[in-house]
Structures are given as C-alpha cells and as structure tokens.
C-alpha cells in the first residue's frame, strides 16, 4: 500500500511515493539510533548513583560524600570514571573503519545485523559486571556495536528514502537517538529507587532490549537498491526492489542514475585513498567538520553528565535524574519537530537558527553559574531551575539543528563510490571527539568552572559561521545528483575545478 506524492527535485525528477514498506524498513533500521541513544543516556545516570559509585569508583564516592574541601566543580573529576563513559567511543572509532569494508562489500544490512548482535552481548556483560574491568570491557563491546550501526544506518535511511522525504526519514535516526536517551533516563530514575543497591544492573542490562529488536528485525530488512547495484550486475533484481521501495513500476530514470553511479564506484579500488582527490574535497571537509562541530556544541556533556551537572549545582540524586528526563523529553520533541520541517525550511536555516539559540542559552547558563555557584555550597533552588530551563532551551536548539542534521547532511552528500568510506570518516570523527569531550569534560569543569559554557558557546559561533558561508542547501536533491550543489556553490566550485566537471560530463554521456 503506497501513499504520497510524486518525487521531484531541483536536481531531476524521479517517480515514486512514500510507501509503507519504506516506512517500516526505516523504522526498524532506526533502532540503531535507539541503542546509541540509550547508551549515551544510561552512563550519566548510573554514574550519579551512589551504589554504582561505591562498587566501582569508591574514590569518587568518598570525594563526593566526605571531602568538604573539594570544589563543587571537581567532585567527579576521575579519569577512571570518564574512561567508563568514553571507552565506548574509542572502540566505536576503530570499528567504524572495519564497518566500512563490510558495508561496501556485503551491504548495509549485514553491518546493521552485526552491530545489533555485538551490542546485545555487551549489554549482558555490563549488567552482570562484578569489577571495573568487566564493566569497561562491556562498554568496549557496546562501542563496536554502535560503530557498525552508526556507519550503516544513516546510509540505509538516505538510500531508501525518496528525495522529497529524505530529510524527515534520516532525521528519524536522531529522533531514535533521543528516544533511546529518554528511555535510559526514565529507567535510571526508576532503578535508582530500588532497595539493595542493584538498580544500576537493570539500567545497564536493559540496553539489550533495543539491541535484540534491532538484531531480530535486521534479519528481515531489505537491502537498498543502491547497494544491490553496487555489489552485483543483477540490475533486474535491483529494479524490482526499487519498484517496491518507490511504489511504482516507472523507476527507470532513478535506476539509470544508480547504474551510472555504480559504474564509477567499481573503478574505485581504494575509496579511502580516492576520497582525498580534489573533486571530493567539499565532501571530505564536511565529513570532518560537521561531526567535529556536532561534538563541540557540548551536547554530549549534557547527555553524559547531566545528572552529575545537576548535582554539582545543588540538586539531589533523584532530582538530578528527573531533570535529565525533562531535558530528554525536550530533545526528543524538538527532533520530532525537525523531522516535520527540515524538508520545507531546508538544512541551512535549521543549522543557523539552532546555533543562535544554543549560543544564547550557553552564555546565560555560564553567567548564572559564574555569579551564583562558588567552589563550596550550592546555589538557590530558584537559580538551579533557571539553569535547568536554559539547558532545555539549549537542548531544543540542538534537537532541531545539529543533532539530526549532523547525521543527515553527511549521509546524503557522498557519491556512491566513496559513500561507505565517507560515512566511516564521519562516524570516526564523531567518536574521536566524543571521546575527547567525554574524557576531558570533568577535568575541564574542574579547571574552567563556569567558563566551560563560554568555551562551547565560542565553538557554536564558529560552526554557525561555517554553515552560513560553506554549506550549500541539499534539500530535495536526489542523492545520486548531489554533485550539482558543489558545482554551483560560490566557493567549492573553485576548489573542485575542472576535474569534477569533466568526469561528470563523461558520466552523463555514458
């Protein structure tokens, strides 16, 4: 059963509709976002639970409870504690490069399946952990699972989606991340109240639920037409899949573009080497800059350490976990709004509006903490809740801009021949700087104090200017015709030069 409108775009015209088949397939694949979000949300919650700290990080617990001389900003400063959070991202960084080869050679579906299965094993290990080494090894396995899922799922969504709805469908990945984080916050809030001090085990083990859904569901996922054509000469099979995906038999124009892209793809033996060529310079810059900027918004500081941050400003354990639920709800709601408007307003407008909103909120939070929170004692409850409101405003700005668009834009800009390699670079850069931010934040909070918010606010100014000057609009442009936006851009057309134009002319003549 198909529903929707004909797909048209500035870059060309394809026939087709948004089908229930595509919607269900993308919903299942987007469970890869849920496992990622759950893991982001659960770590901050359990590290604020007293029984968890007493068992695995007794030095942190002692500083928090007994050492009255330690600054509010330094109570949680522990490299071992941050290693628990950040170890996942080192593993994910390494895994993403292996995932690139699997995704290119065997398809998007096997990478999603493998990611779900490894994540499932790690969730079991984390819930059963008896020492800190077992705990961190479980996090490493979770990182491998997330590395494979994050490499394959955004590609899957972009390739399955009609151009008209690609933004909304791909933003479903970030929406799923938000749902996962919110679920973790709700579970943390409930398990913290369990008597006996073992609630953290439930929090960690519950990650197995979305992982099991993803693993089982991946068995039934169809492969994308792009991947079928890239990996074989069976164009008839790809055509049948494309007809099913688009809900129409008239898919020849899109099929021809996929075949042309595949011909170029097969001439590329070393995609990581070829992505360095001048003709791919815009995509390479975006593959590095966008995930880097996404991390230095400071959002994962809120996601990882929100309960710790709220305890720093004087909220109790339950109140800090409840505050994390509030920010999670705001983030999920704003990402859902982004899904509805991204293909109407475009990517650039949301990036810029969200950047301004985040900057204002961060500066105000930093100012309040600088004025009201000293090294000892808390701040008034009134100010604490003002900080919470401002953080919600900041999270909302991220939720409809850099959150979903940080995954959407990189996944839609790469030509087929370097798409898998390009997405691996995106994931690796994201994990690298997530690791750096996660590993250094508690120390930075200790040394910068309230200045940490001004630090991240400065980066928001830089990234907003970057988008304004260097990112072209990509809404509704077919994914295999995306080279048009670079050839027409005032700056990038000077960079890619004649090489890209000549090769494009050859492809069109083929």
Curated annotation (Swiss-Prot):
<feature type="transmembrane region" description="Helical; Name=7">
    <location>
        <begin position="284"/>
        <end position="304"/>
    </location>
</feature>
<feature type="transmembrane region" description="Helical; Name=11">
    <location>
        <begin position="428"/>
        <end position="448"/>
    </location>
</feature>
<feature type="transmembrane region" description="Helical; Name=6">
    <location>
        <begin position="202"/>
        <end position="222"/>
    </location>
</feature>
<keyword id="KW-0762">Sugar transport</keyword>
<feature type="transmembrane region" description="Helical; Name=1">
    <location>
        <begin position="23"/>
        <end position="43"/>
    </location>
</feature>
<protein>
    <recommendedName>
        <fullName>Hexose carrier protein HEX6</fullName>
    </recommendedName>
</protein>
<comment type="similarity">
    <text>Belongs to the major facilitator superfamily. Sugar transporter (TC 2.A.1.1) family.</text>
</comment>
<dbReference type="InterPro" id="IPR045262">
    <property type="entry name" value="STP/PLT_plant"/>
</dbReference>
<dbReference type="InterPro" id="IPR003663">
    <property type="entry name" value="Sugar/inositol_transpt"/>
</dbReference>
<feature type="transmembrane region" description="Helical; Name=4">
    <location>
        <begin position="140"/>
        <end position="160"/>
    </location>
</feature>
<dbReference type="Pfam" id="PF00083">
    <property type="entry name" value="Sugar_tr"/>
</dbReference>
<dbReference type="GO" id="GO:0016020">
    <property type="term" value="C:membrane"/>
</dbReference>
<keyword id="KW-0812">Transmembrane</keyword>
<feature type="topological domain" description="Cytoplasmic">
    <location>
        <begin position="1"/>
        <end position="22"/>
    </location>
</feature>
<feature type="transmembrane region" description="Helical; Name=9">
    <location>
        <begin position="349"/>
        <end position="369"/>
    </location>
</feature>
<keyword id="KW-1133">Transmembrane helix</keyword>
<dbReference type="InterPro" id="IPR044778">
    <property type="entry name" value="MFS_STP/MST-like_plant"/>
</dbReference>
<feature type="transmembrane region" description="Helical; Name=3">
    <location>
        <begin position="118"/>
        <end position="128"/>
    </location>
</feature>
<feature type="transmembrane region" description="Helical; Name=12">
    <location>
        <begin position="451"/>
        <end position="471"/>
    </location>
</feature>
<dbReference type="GO" id="GO:0015145">
    <property type="term" value="F:monosaccharide transmembrane transporter activity"/>
</dbReference>
<dbReference type="InterPro" id="IPR020846">
    <property type="entry name" value="MFS_dom"/>
</dbReference>
<keyword id="KW-0813">Transport</keyword>
<dbReference type="InterPro" id="IPR005828">
    <property type="entry name" value="MFS_sugar_transport-like"/>
</dbReference>
<keyword id="KW-0769">Symport</keyword>
<feature type="transmembrane region" description="Helical; Name=8">
    <location>
        <begin position="325"/>
        <end position="345"/>
    </location>
</feature>
<feature type="transmembrane region" description="Helical; Name=10">
    <location>
        <begin position="382"/>
        <end position="402"/>
    </location>
</feature>
<dbReference type="InterPro" id="IPR036259">
    <property type="entry name" value="MFS_trans_sf"/>
</dbReference>
<feature type="topological domain" description="Cytoplasmic">
    <location>
        <begin position="472"/>
        <end position="510"/>
    </location>
</feature>
<feature type="transmembrane region" description="Helical; Name=2">
    <location>
        <begin position="83"/>
        <end position="103"/>
    </location>
</feature>
<dbReference type="InterPro" id="IPR005829">
    <property type="entry name" value="Sugar_transporter_CS"/>
</dbReference>
<feature type="transmembrane region" description="Helical; Name=5">
    <location>
        <begin position="169"/>
        <end position="189"/>
    </location>
</feature>
<comment type="function">
    <text>Active uptake of hexoses. Probable glucose/hydrogen symport.</text>
</comment>
<keyword id="KW-0472">Membrane</keyword>
<dbReference type="GO" id="GO:0015293">
    <property type="term" value="F:symporter activity"/>
</dbReference>
């Amino acid at each position: 059963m198909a529903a929707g409108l004909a797909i048209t775009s500035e870059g060309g015209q394809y026939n087709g509709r948004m089908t229930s088949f595509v919607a269900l397939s993308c919903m299942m694949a987007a469970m890869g976002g849920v496992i990622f979000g759950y893991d982001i949300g659960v770590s901050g919650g359990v590290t604020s639970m007293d029984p968890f700290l007493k068992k695995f990080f007794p030095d942190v617990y002692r500083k928090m409870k007994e050492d009255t001389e330690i600054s509010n900003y330094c109570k949680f400063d522990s490299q071992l504690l941050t290693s628990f959070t950040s170890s996942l991202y080192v593993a994910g960084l390494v895994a993403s490069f292996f995932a690139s080869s699997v995704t290119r050679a065997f398809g998007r579906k096997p990478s999603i399946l493998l990611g779900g299965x490894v994540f499932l094993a790690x969730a079991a290990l984390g819930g059963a952990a008896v020492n800190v080494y077992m705990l961190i090894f479980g996090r490493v396995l979770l990182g491998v699972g997330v590395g494979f899922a994050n490499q394959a799922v955004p590609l899957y969504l972009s390739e399955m989606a009609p151009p008209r709805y690609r933004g909304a469908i791909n933003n479903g990945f970030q929406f799923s991340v938000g749902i996962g984080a919110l679920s973790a916050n709700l579970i943390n809030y409930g398990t913290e109240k369990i008597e006996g001090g073992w609630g953290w085990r439930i929090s960690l083990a519950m990650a197995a639920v979305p992982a099991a859904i993803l693993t089982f569901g991946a068995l039934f996922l169809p492969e994308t037409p792009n991947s079928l054509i890239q990996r074989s000469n069976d164009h008839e099979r790809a055509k049948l899949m494309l007809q099913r995906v688009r809900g129409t038999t008239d898919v020849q124009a899109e099929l021809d573009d996929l075949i042309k892209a595949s011909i170029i793809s097969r001439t590329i033996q070393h995609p990581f080497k070829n992505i360095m060529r001048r003709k791919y310079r815009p995509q390479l810059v975006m593959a590095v800059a966008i995930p880097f900027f996404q991390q230095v918004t400071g959002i994962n500081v809120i996601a990882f350490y929100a309960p710790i941050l709220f305890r720093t400003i004087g909220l109790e354990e339950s109140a800090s976990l409840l505050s994390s639920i509030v920010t999670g709800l705001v983030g999920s709601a704003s990402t859902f709004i982004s899904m509805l408007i991204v293909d109407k307003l475009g990517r650039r407008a949301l990036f810029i509006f969200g950047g301004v909103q985040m900057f204002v909120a961060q500066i105000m939070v930093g100012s309040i903490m600088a004025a009201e929170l000293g090294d000892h004692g808390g701040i008034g409850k009134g100010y604490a809740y003002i900080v919470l409101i401002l953080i919600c405003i900041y999270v909302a700005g991220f939720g409809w801009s850099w959150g979903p668009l940080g995954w959407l834009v990189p996944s839609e800009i790469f030509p087929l021949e370097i798409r898998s390699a390009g997405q691996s670079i995106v994931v690796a850069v994201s994990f690298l700087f997530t690791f750096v931010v996660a590993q250094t934040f508690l120390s930075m909070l200790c040394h910068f104090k309230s200045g940490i918010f001004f630090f991240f606010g400065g980066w928001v100014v830089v990234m907003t200017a970057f988008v304004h000057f260097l990112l072209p609009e990509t809404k509704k442009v077919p994914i295999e015709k995306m080279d048009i936006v670079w050839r027409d851009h005032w700056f990038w057309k000077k960079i890619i030069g004649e090489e890209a134009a000549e090769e494009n002319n050859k492809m069109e003549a083929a």
